[in-house]
Amino acid sequence: MAARPISIEHEALRLNLGCSDAHVKGWTNVDRCEPADVIADLSQRWPWNDSSVAAIKSWDIFEHMVSKIHTMNECHRVMKPGAKLDLFIPTTDGRGAFQDPTHVSFWTPNDLFYFVETYVEWQRFHVAYGITARFRCIEQTHLEYPNKVWKLRAILECVK
């Protein structure tokens, strides 16, 4: 599936998280091991300044992160207001979430309810749960692939 272009300013910091060998030209390709432009342990505080990132591409990486709250909070912390987060995650509606032995968190489309400001779950629980992330949902689709794999695709906009 081809990536939908994300409109952002020229020369802006754009992160391709969990890039593995799928480097994107013009983006900062990030992984926990080489080859990557930045080697980082994303389970810790991320090595970018607050409000410094114009876009994040996160395809098939968030399921490798133990804490959904930490991951989404760090995305929000480093993103500029209006920055776009492009997510692509296998969901528990299919086998993709469970087939890879390195997956440690399991996602459904409803998980976004806790990070998107228009949902009652975010409004009721974000303070109690320690969720500082606040997004608007620009686009969300749930896609079926061969071998009973379902994936969530979402474009979220950072709200500050």
What are the language-model segments listed below?
Residues 10-93:
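Conserved SAM-binding loop
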Residues 1-12:
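Conserved alpha-helix/loop element of class I SAM-dependent methyltransferases that forms part
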